């Protein structure tokens, strides 16, 4: 009986970390490390452990702090904390423990990696969750900074510092975030309105929000071109990443011409792999450059 209870509790604690989201953010860190020319296996393994723990910990703290909002929305009311299966104190303690261990591991790589890790936690919890999420539709920009922190950490782990190129790569995540969050918030518009969360579709309407998503996608393509033209990334990156971004831009333009809540869910699913493919292209470009120069 105790074993079963332990398994259920462990499953709930794992749920707090949002494994799919955590895995995607972890990949951005690993792929950026490789794209930045990182070749040390020990540093890569340490980075993987540090990011897995720190991202999971930050997400768990976020879940604890957002439990009151989650309890008001049918989509999220069965999550571990709002459902009562895990207490807020348990979720906070679990999350902080994971983050502290992850931060310690990131410092073993170098101080800049630890700085990027801390930046992610600070923006996600203090700026996004506790300050802006319940006040402004622009909160996702600050959430985007948190989402971009793992890629900064990956670059810092490889290069020992955070350079302009790293910031430009991090901007990819920030520009992708509107598609990731706003399409799903269009689909669940009534839930966010009932919970009084000022998401863009609630405050600005579906049409304006869909046009802003198009704008962010255009900027993302410009950024990809700049990363190629300014030199940190080569033709492999552009050839592999640009087609999927252009395809997604076309889909978002079509949606903006005739937006609907039903179609927003499909657009959310179309948006999901875009970031993964872009960062995979960054990694493959880095591998190609290493092989070419050897």
From Swiss-Prot:
GO terms of biological process kind: heme biosynthetic process; heme O biosynthetic process
A molecular function (GO) term: protoheme IX farnesyltransferase activity
GO CC annotation: plasma membrane
Pathway named in the protein's UniProt entry: Porphyrin-containing compound metabolism; heme O biosynthesis; heme O from protoheme: step 1/1
Tagged with keyword Cell membrane: yes
UniProt KW keywords: Cell membrane, Heme biosynthesis, Membrane, Transferase, Transmembrane, Transmembrane helix
Bilayer-crossing regions: 19-39, 41-61, 89-109, 111-131, 138-158, 166-186, 218-238, 272-292
Chemical reaction(s) catalysed: heme b + (2E,6E)-farnesyl diphosphate + H2O = Fe(II)-heme o + diphosphate
General remark: Carbon 2 of the heme B porphyrin ring is defined according to the Fischer nomenclature.
Record function comment: Converts heme B (protoheme IX) to heme O by substitution of the vinyl group on carbon 2 of heme B porphyrin ring with a hydroxyethyl farnesyl side group.
Similarity section: Belongs to the UbiA prenyltransferase family. Protoheme IX farnesyltransferase subfamily.
UniProt name for this protein: Protoheme IX farnesyltransferase
Gene for this chain: ctaB
